[in-house]
Amino acid sequence: MKSIKKALALLIVLTMVFAFAAPVAHAKARTTKIGVGLYQDSGAAVSAVKAYLANLEDTLNVKFTYTVLSNTDEAQNITKVQELIAAGCDGIIITMDMGTEAILQECADAGVYCAGYLCDFDSSFRTNYDNVFKNELFLGTVADGGCADEARRGYDFFDSVIEYNERTPDAPIRHVAMTVFPAFAFPYQQSFAAQFVEKVEEYNAANPDKAIEVDPLSDETDILMFRPMDSTYFSKHPGIDAIVSICSGSFVYPTMVSAGVSNTMKLFAAGYNDGDEAVFGSKGAYQMEIVSPVEAITYPLVLLLNKINGAQFPDQPAEAERRGSSVLIINSDEDLAKFQHSIYLSFKPEDAFLTPEDVVALTAYNNPDATYAGLVEILDHMTIDDIK
C-alpha cells in the first residue's frame, strides 16, 4: 500500500502544480449526477459504499443517487435505469448483467454513459461482446474479485481451511460440505466448489494422515435458492466439521444456530453481514469471510467522470475492459482487528483506502499525468494487509 500511496501523493502534487500553472478542466460548473444500481438496499456493503461515495461528493462536485437492481428480472432493471435517467443522471453504475443491451439502448437514447461494479458481465462478454463491450457508452466494469476466467475463489477457501487447521492442530477440520447459489444467477460458484475439491484432493495425496473429506454437492440441499439453508442439510451431511459456503454465510449461519450446531461446527463463507464479528474466529463459528473492497467502485466512477468531462487517459484501451480487484480475506482474529479499521466495517471515510484527493488525482480531466494503468493498479492494493 505504501507504493500506491506514494504514487497517489505524487499525482496529487502534480495536479496542484498544473492547477496553478495553467487552466485545467476541473469538475463541471454544474454538479455531475451519477446513478448507482446496487444489488440490495441495505447491509454492511451498501452502507459502506454510500459512506465512501458521500465523502467524494464535495471534492468531485458529484451527487450520487441509488436504486436496486435484480439478478432475475430484466424488465425491472430496465425500468430502474429509465428512472435514473429521468432523474437527470449523467452516468450510471450497474451491478447486474441482466438486460444490459437494452439498458445501453436506453443510455444511448439519453446520451448517458454506463459502467459496471461488482460484476464481470460474463454473459455479455461471452455472448454479446460487440453490443456491450464495443458499445461506446459502456466504459468497462470491475468484478467482485477476479473475473470469470481468472477467479480463484475455491482456492481461497482451501487456503483458509488449511490455515485454520495449522492454527488449531488439536481440533482440525477433517470433513466438510459446501453450499452454492444456483448456476443461473451465479454460474461460476460450482466451478469454485470444483476448485476447492481439486485442491483438497492434491492435499490429501500429499498428506494422507491429514486427509480432508469433502461431500459432493447435493442438488437437494446444497444449492440455496436465495433463501436460508434447510435444516435437512445436516442429515444429508452427517459428521461434518465445517461448511464451506461459497454463497453468503447469511443464508447458512441462522440454520446452524437453529439446529444447535453453531457452537461446534465451523463456517467458511463469502460475504460479511452486520454482527458477524461477534461470532468470528475464537468467538464463534465463522472462521473466514471474503468481501470486496467498496473502494473498487472508484474504477467505474473515474471512467464515467472522465467521459462526462470530455477527457480520457493517454493509454485508454480502445474497447471497454473488465477488471478484477483484490479482495479482503478475513481468516483470523488478527485479520478481523484490521478489518474493523476498514470503511466496510466502520463506515468512516477516513478508513477508506482512497481519499477524495486521491480520486481527483486519478482523473484525466483534473490531472494530465493520470493514466489508465494507474487507475487499474489501485485495484490490486485493497487487501487485508493493506489496511494500516
PLM region descriptions:
Residues 18-30:
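Sec-dependent signal peptide cleavage junction
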Residues 31-60, 65-79, 95-98, 181-191:
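Extracytoplasmic "Venus flytrap"
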Residues 53, 78, 82, 91-114, ...:
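Hydrophobic alpha-helical
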Residues 59-71, 178, 201-224:
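Short beta-strand elements in bilobed, periplasmic/extracellular small-molecule ligand-binding domains
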Residues 65-163, 175:
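Acidic/His-rich segments in extracytoplasmic proteins that coordinate ligands and/or metal ions
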Residues 131-177, 226-227, 271-277, 293-309:
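Hydrophobic alpha-helical segments within soluble ligand-binding/sensing domains
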Residues 262-334:
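Flexible loop/turn connectors
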Residues 303-388:
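Hinge/cleft segment of the Venus flytrap/periplasmic-binding protein
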